From Swiss-Prot:
Endonuclease IV plays a role in DNA repair. It cleaves phosphodiester bonds at apurinic or apyrimidinic (AP) sites, generating a 3'-hydroxyl group and a 5'-terminal sugar phosphate. Belongs to the AP endonuclease 2 family. It is an enzyme of class 3 (hydrolase). Its cofactor is Zn(2+). Zn(2+) 1 binds at residues 56, 96, 129. This is Probable endonuclease 4. Pfam families: AP_endonuc_2 (PF01261). It catalyses: Endonucleolytic cleavage to 5'-phosphooligonucleotide end-products. The keyword Nuclease applies. The keyword Nuclease applies. Zn(2+) 2 binds at residues 129, 162, 191, 233. It comes from Mycobacterium ulcerans (strain Agy99).
Length: 252
């Protein structure tokens, strides 16, 4: 089971070595911008590296939106991100589920997701990540994810489970792993994060493992059940300890 972290995109290989990471995740551009990722001078080096590199797509992406000024740029930047991810030999691109205006629009949101995936041209796998909060979200509650998966599951899309997000959404972590696997067939990646807030808060505020509200042993049980590569999206100070903690627990 590979264990690593979300690191600065400046030199991910050096960051991985410094943190003892066996796998990393990076942004390829500003996560709060619609601008396409710039070509990387080290693309060939990253592509040749043995280290698996995952790419997190910009937060602005909302493939479910009925608003053309949001949905169309979302499709464009996802395509550009996947193209840039292919250039570095990325293992996958992770994208949030987005949301619609009201619950009456959920089914239309699922169809917009389907259309976006049908139009996407890439050999890089794309993983949907569950989200912490937001009204009328595509991927906050597991029941809604199941409905979305009925529409998009046969496109080859994968799934990334974020423990902080599931906690914030009020989902049970270990039982939730079984529920998600029953829907998607597998979990492809885990974002193992503690939460600064109470269960069901809807707040997406990560904490280093053991420094938040989630029992560390519960996190260990969840990631063990998920049986997928692990990325710690926690504060840089303490992240090396997060990796070491998980490695000790999961290898014991």
């Amino acid at each position: 089971m590979l264990i690593g972290s979300h690191v600065s995109p400046q030199d991910p290989l050096a960051a991985a070595q410094a943190e003892g990471a066996e796998v990393v995740q990076i942004f390829l551009g500003n996560p709060q911008s619609w601008k396409a990722p710039r070509p990387r001078e080290d693309a060939a080096q990253l592509k040749a590296a043995a280290l698996p590199i995952y790419v997190h797509a910009p937060y602005l992406i909302n493939l479910a939106s009925a608003n053309n000024k949001v949905r169309i740029p979302s499709r464009k930047i996802l395509q550009q991100t996947c193209d840039a991810a292919a250039d570095i030999g990325a293992a996958a691109v992770i994208v949030h589920g987005g949301h619609v205006a009201d619950d009456n629009d959920l089914d239309e949101g699922f169809q917009r997701w389907r259309k976006a995936l049908d139009q996407l041209q890439t050999d890089v796998p794309v993983y949907l990540e569950n989200t912490a909060g937001g009204e009328h979200a595509m991927a906050r509650h597991f029941d809604t994810i199941a409905r979305l998966w009925d529409v998009i599951g046969d496109t080859g899309i994968g799934f990334c489970l974020d423990t902080c997000h599931a906690w914030a959404a009020g989902e049970q972590l270990v039982h939730g792993v079984d529920r998600i696997k029953a829907v998607t067939g597998r979990i492809d990646l885990v974002h193992c994060n503690d939460s600064r807030d109470a269960a069901g808060s809807g707040r997406d505020r990560h904490a280093n493992l053991g420094a938040g509200q989630i029992d560390p042993e519960l996190l260990v049980a969840a990631v063990r059940a998920a049986d997928a590569p692990i990325i710690c999206e926690t504060a840089e100070e303490g992240r090396k300890d997060d990796i070491a903690f998980l490695r000790e627990k999961l290898n014991s």
